[in-house]
A protein has these predicted regions:
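Papain-like cysteine protease catalytic cores
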Residues: 1-53, 89-92
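Exposed substrate/partner-binding surface patches
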Residues: 19-22, 26, 46-278
Length: 278
């Protein structure tokens, strides 16, 4: 069982245990968001939307160098055309349709799973993707949300005198989309075997003599020690031609990279997207 499977099983067990209690929705309120699965007709005014709950956002690593590149691809979608065109019940015909997924709502604590494990159908083996993949300490997700995309589409329609069939939601404050990195789960090894350890930002201690820089800790089995966040690149981003070189010029930490990221919203919000006072 890898870390993602453990996380899924843990949340399933917690949800089952809390059913019919006062805290039944605590995981959803804290960690849960919603994705919007959209079908957008091209050449017809109709569109459909199906909501999908999530506790973790899965992002591709392969072929991307940065988390924002992967997020751009996440919401890009695909065109259904020709034989694959979508049948519009209202138009009573097949039409070219954009099928895409975007973020409808965000949780206070966002889990991002980096897809570092995949199945190679040529070799019929599970492999680990050790490619370099950068992620920031501060993350803004506004342009990957349904509200933002609808607003952009409405602006385009306004420019050409068109009319949208979708209602644009009330604007959320910018702080709704801003996150700080709070934790990183590192995997060291290959697709068949390995070891996990965690980097966690100390919420209470800013670090003596370190100004406003928060203290980070490394939790590795029973070993707990301070971690210098300036070393995050070498510890967690993965392998590249120029990354992870030791003093002799040889690569080190091959196979050691981030697998799961935990981001905390800078300003907490409730289910109604209202700020929660500190």
């Amino acid at each position: 069982m890898d870390a993602e499977e453990f996380f899924i099983n843990l949340f399933d067990k917690i949800e089952t245990t809390l059913k019919k209690t006062a805290q039944e929705k605590i995981l959803t309120r804290t960690w849960g968001g919603q994705l919007a699965n959209e079908l957008i007709g091209k050449g017809c005014p109709h569109r459909s939307e199906r909501d999908e709950p999530y506790f973790a956002l899965p992002l591709q690593v392969k072929n991307f160098k940065h988390i924002y590149e992967s997020l751009d691809a996440f919401i890009l979608g695909e065109m259904l055309e020709g034989d694959n065109a979508y049948y519009c019940d209202k138009c009573e015909k097949k039409i070219p349709t954009l099928k895409r997924v975007c973020i409808k709502s965000l949780p206070n604590y966002l889990i991002v799973v980096l897809k570092r494990f995949e199945f190679n159908f040529d070799t019929m083996q599970k492999i680990k993707v050790n490619d370099y993949f950068e992620f920031p300490e501060t993350l803004n997700l506004q342009r990957y949300t349904l509200d933002f995309l609808l607003e952009q589409e409405q602006s385009l329609l306004d420019g050409v005198g068109g009319e949208s069939q979708m209602e644009v939601a009330d604007k959320k404050p910018h702080s709704y989309y801003d996150y700080d990195l709070r934790g990183v789960v590192i995997h060291k090894g290959n697709a068949d075997a390995g070891h996990y350890y965690s980097l966690i930002k100390d919420h209470k201690d800013t670090g003596a003599g370190n100004g406003d820089q928060a203290r980070w800790l490394e939790f590795n089995d029973t070993d707990v020690k301070e971690f210098d966040i300036s070393n995050l690149k070498n510890e967690a981003y993965g392998d590249s031609a120029t990354n992870n070189l030791d003093p002799t010029g040889k690569r080190n930490k091959r196979g050691t990279n981030a697998y799961i990221l935990i981001y905390e919203r800078k300003q907490l919000f409730n289910e109604k997207s209202e700020k929660i006072d500190d």
